[in-house]
Amino acid sequence: MIEKQSKNVLEGIDALIDMLEHYEDTDKKRQKIKEKENEGDRMVHEILSELNKTFITPIDREDICKLVSSLDDILDNLEAVSERLVLYKIKKPPKYMLEFAQTLHKASYNVHEAIALLRNFKDATQMRIFCKEVHTQENEGDALLRKAMAELFNGKDAVEIIKIKELYDDMESAIDRCEDVADVVGDILVKYA
């Protein structure tokens, strides 16, 4: 079920990338991302419900909760970005948004692949590689944020600066949540592999 949730996150990111690459019908595209976020919320509820009914779990309950929560946070950030793009009446995507989204996609892909391997712990080495890649992408996200902010703060329109800063912060936060998932997967590996 967690694997389905991570796939849903990837689909949400794909929808955001589509929105940024083809920046028209933004309200319709925002709604598609909202649907992915709602689907994610349903999955969280379902997973936690099943967890409450299950006496013995293959991994610690706390780790399951952390995975589920961090994956949900990624979708929450995506929804916030798409909402702000529409509500703030952003005419075209800010310069670094697509690059943030692509970095987030790479990180989420690696998260998804690591989670898929959790099912049977067969390839701990490959899981570690996926987790290490997520950390690399998180560092790329941090560097991109610094670069984007430095350029942004050279602007003159304070309102525009605030709007775009919030968008960049949400994207970087989503990448950070991918790193949180990778950290939990790493913890699980230490405990069980």
Describe the function of each predicted region.
Residues 1-193:
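Cytosolic, long alpha-helical scaffolding segments
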